[in-house]
Curated annotation (Swiss-Prot):
The chain crosses the membrane at residues 118-141. Residues 142 are vesicular. It comes from Saccharomyces cerevisiae (strain ATCC 204508 / S288c) (Baker's yeast). This is Protein transport protein BET1. Residues 52-114 form the t-SNARE coiled-coil homology domain. One of its GO terms (cellular component) is COPII-coated ER to Golgi transport vesicle.
Amino acid sequence: MSSRFAGGNAYQRDTGRTQLFGPADGSNSLDDNVSSALGSTDKLDYSQSTLASLESQSEEQMGAMGQRIKALKSLSLKMGDEIRGSNQTIDQLGDTFHNTSVKLKRTFGNMMEMARRSGISIKTWLIIFFMVGVLFFWVWIT
């Protein structure tokens, strides 16, 4: 190791090294042991029974996948119908709330107009309604 860094050039790159992750001596030992399945010279010979077996397995798996796809399609169609129905229900509920709001505003306006025309203040009307409420509550609990 001391001979490698001799002469004070420890900061310089080793000129014999050409690969980042290869050995330091420059040999290409990784390529010697690598074998490829595509580059092999062994001939693979499948018999007709093996090929038929593989094909039948493939057809079975394709059939099962087809059934699963049909089930998913059916499920997604049912989900779409449910979502559309829910959206219609929500729209109807919104319309109902709007109509109720309009009716309550109109009723409150009519009540305020009635109170103004009668000459009795709103405080008096509130006291009367409170007394009637207390009377109903008293009858309810006894």
